[in-house]
Amino acid sequence: MEEHIIADKTLIRTAKVISAVFTPFSIPFLAFLVLFIFSYLRIMPLQYKLIVLGVVYCFTILMPTLTIFIFRKINGFSPEELVERKRRYIPFILTITSYVFCLLMMHRLNIPWYMTGIILSALVVMIICVIVNLKWKLSEHMAGAGAVIGGLVAFSALFSYNPVWWLCLFILVAGVLGTARIILRHHTLGEVMGGFAVGLICSLLVLHPLSNILFRIFPLLRALFN
C-alpha cells in the first residue's frame, strides 16, 4: 500500500514538473530562440536578435507572469484555484492585453510577418480559449503544444526543410504533456484534445506561407473592384 502511495506521489510530482517546464508562456520566446539558432535567421545581427528576444520575453513571459501573480495575491487565489473555469477570465485577459502590446511593438520595429505571426497565432489561440471557456474548458498547455507542431509544418514550407524528426520529437512531448495534465486532473481527455486541435489549426492558418499570400491578395482584389 505504501509503495502505491509513493508511486502516486512520484507520478504527480513528475506531472507537475512537466507542466511547469512546458508552460504556454515560454513557447513564443522559445520559438524565436529556435528560429535565431537553427534557421537562416542566425545570420542576422546579434543586436537585432537581442532586441526581438527582449521584446518577446517582456511581453509574453515577464508581463503575463507578473500581472497574474499580482492578481492572484490580491484575490488570495492559489495556482490550483486559477484552474477553475470561472477564475480563468482575468488571467486570459491580462495575457491577451500583453500580447496585443507585443504585436504593436513588433509592428513599430518592422519585424517580418513570419515572426509577428508567431505572436498573432498565440493571440488567436487565447481569444478562442476565452470564448470556449464560457461553456467549456480547453487546455492551454496543449493548445501551445499544438501551435508548436502547426508552426513546424508551416515554417517547413517557408524555409524548405524536412520537419519529420522535429515533428516526432514534439508530438512525443505533446503526448507526455497531455498525459501530465490529465494525471493532475486539471483537464479531461476531451479538453486536452480540444486544446491541441485549436493550437494546431490556428498556427497552421496564421503561419503558413499560403495564408500570407491570401492576406496580401484580398486587399488587392478589393482595391481593384472598388
Describe the role of every protein-language-model region.
Residues 1-15:
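Short, Lys/Arg-rich, polar N-terminal cytosolic tail immediately upstream
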Residues 18, 78-94:
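Juxtamembrane helix-capping/reentrant segments at transmembrane boundaries
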Residues 18-39:
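The first (N-terminal) embedded transmembrane alpha-helix
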Residues 24-29, 60-69, 96-104, 122-130, ...:
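Transmembrane alpha-helical segments of multi-pass membrane transport proteins and ion-pumping complexes
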Residues 39-48, 77-80, 108-110, 211-224:
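Membrane-interface helix termini and inter-helical loops of multi-pass transporters
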Residues 45-61, 85-86:
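Loop-to-helix transition at the N-terminal end of transmembrane alpha-helices
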Residues 93-103, 144-149:
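Core segments of transmembrane alpha-helices
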Residues 112-226:
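Membrane-embedded catalytic cores of phosphoryl/pyrophosphoryl-handling enzymes
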